[in-house]
Amino acid sequence: DRDSCVDKSQCAKYGYYYQCDECCKKAGDRAGTCEYFKCKCNP
């Protein structure tokens, strides 16, 4: 789910990150980006 995207993320500090995007889409959101080492989903 969406929380697992954020909780498991240890991603690049800035910008688009593929795994966040994929995980967020599976959780039902449009896309995901990485901000300050955490995934952020876009509803």
Swiss-Prot record:
List the record's Gene Ontology CC terms alphabetically. extracellular region
Q: What is its main location?
A: secreted
Q: In which tissues is it expressed?
A: Expressed by the venom gland.
The protein's superkingdom reads Eukaryota
Family annotation (PROSITE patterns)? ERGTX
User: Under the GO molecular function aspect, what terms does this record hold?
Assistant: potassium channel inhibitor activity; toxin activity
Q: List the disulfide bonds.
A: C5-C23, C11-C34, C20-C39, C24-C41
Mind listing the UniProt keywords for this protein, alphabetically?
Disulfide bond, Ion channel impairing toxin, Knottin, Neurotoxin, Potassium channel impairing toxin, Secreted, Toxin, Voltage-gated potassium channel impairing toxin
Q: Where in the cell is it found?
A: Secreted
The family note in this entry says: Belongs to the ergtoxin family. Gamma-KTx 4 subfamily.
The entry's free-text remark on domains says: The presence of a 'disulfide through disulfide knot' structurally defines this protein as a knottin.
Q: What does this protein do?
A: Reversibly blocks Kv11/ERG potassium channels.
Q: What is this protein called?
A: Potassium channel toxin gamma-KTx 4.5
Organism of origin: Centruroides exilicauda (Bark scorpion)
Tell me the lineage of the source organism: Eukaryota, Metazoa, Ecdysozoa, Arthropoda, Chelicerata
